[in-house]
Amino acid sequence: MKNVTLVLSDGTKFHGKSFGYDAPVAGEVVFNTAMMGYPESLTDPSYAGQLMTLTYPLVGNYGVPPFTFGDDKLPLFMESDKIYASAIIVADYSEEYSHWNACESLAEWLKREHVPGVTGIDTRQLTKVLREHGVMMGKIIFDDEPNNIPEADYEGVNFVDKVSCKEIIKYNEGAGKKVVLVDCGVKANIIRCLVNRGVEVIRVPWNYDYTDMEFDGLFLANGPGDPDMCQDAVDVIRRQMNNSRKPICGIC
């Protein structure tokens, strides 16, 4: 494992070791307090462009499940079809793993998807810093390449456009009530929960104009990045609210 340093935008440094893909990276440093579910969190489109810190101390001990897709073409054990987080930061990475459904280690998965991973970080202290100062930009720098400093400029970047579907996708077609789901970075399990409730889900791109479509309810998914970049979606929602009394549900 190579020595690395996490440098926050205020100059605070945390030292650790690389266990994923060996490449420097920069991005927003955020934290996640879940005790399990790192495969789901890493594939959550909401984490696009972010360095995800896990506060739970031991990570990797149950490996990574396979990318298996159901009849609805949704991944069974992930929230999307790839890792969206730019990096993962943990306190203690377990090289050994055991789970009936595991097919590879977390490190193997990260390397295959070209995603850096850092272990040996005091993640709870890091979380305290983030809690006090809010989301901060950070850089993961390899100590043997001190001049290879990554940069991340999010000015004008529309992460929602990067993660949203590009065409209409229908699930449970012909089931009954129709729900239009605006994909700003929807997780697979949100779609699955809607389908399990016996509705037809019509998944549309984040900026799609659905106001002339026939449907019974509107569902707004959450997603990554700055919501100010999603003015097109806001305009369509406003038109829908002005012209119809159909129910609207938002989720975070």
Predicted regions and their residues:
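RNA-binding accessory domains that recognize and position tRNA/RNA substrates
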Residues: 1-208, 227, 235
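Short, histidine-centered active-site or binding-site loop motifs used for metal coordination
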Residues: 92, 221-222
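Short acidic/histidine-rich motifs immediately flanking catalytic phosphotransfer sites
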Residues: 213-218
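Cysteine-nucleophile active-site neighborhood
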Residues: 222-252
